[in-house]
Curated annotation (Swiss-Prot):
Protein name: Urease accessory protein UreF
Function: Required for maturation of urease via the functional incorporation of the urease nickel metallocenter.
The entry's keywords: Chaperone, Cytoplasm, Nickel insertion
Organism of this sequence: Thermosynechococcus vestitus (strain NIES-2133 / IAM M-273 / BP-1)
Family: Belongs to the UreF family.
Known partners and oligomeric status: UreD, UreF and UreG form a complex that acts as a GTP-hydrolysis-dependent molecular chaperone, activating the urease apoprotein by helping to assemble the nickel containing metallocenter of UreC. The UreE protein probably delivers the nickel.
Gene encoding the protein: ureF
GO CC aspect terms: cytoplasm
Amino acid sequence: MLTDSALLTLLQWVSPALPIGGFNYSEGLETLIAQGQITSAAALQDWLGFELAFGSAQWETAVMARVYRAIAKGDFEAVHQWNAWLSAARESAELRAQNWQMGTALINLVAALDRLPPALQTGQPYPWNVSVAFCIAANLADIPLETALLGYLHSWATTLINAAVKLIPLGQTAGQLLLRQLQPQIQQTVQQSLNVTDDNLESCTLGLALASMQHETLYCRLFRS
């Protein structure tokens, strides 16, 4: 059950105003827009919808479900293992740096506002991925797993849509309409992620990987990924 306190905390963690630097990143969108591959709200919806169904958003939420359950059981070794798995799964230096930077900022914020379990304060061989840090924050606030995943994907979509509003550009209303239209796919991705087995953790992110790698050499960049 989502209590009022947990709801307010979730709204804080998914707010675009959260000081973890999400506004600095486009996750390859800047490359695709510069190359003329995404030039409209419809094209952006197709791209984000694919990421939700088959791409990084799909497998990341499946891993987040495992992390959340491991924290709930006190299996902090599994938390570290899945964080390392996510770090290894990043397909470019920019995507890995993005997740580590945002994850470090978020875990520091969580430590300042809440009390981290001692087992999560030390022994981490890699910086925290932002999705793992989000799971830790959600678990400490007693936010239910499914609700936490919905909030995370809503925040992810909001960040990328806001980047596209600047880059394409799109109108603010068009951006909000797109966010509303993605709601069914966000819900479907969360439901699927709750039941994915370890053997079926997979994605098809060739376009994202190439766009992210090519972003490093763009002549002019507004975003860090």
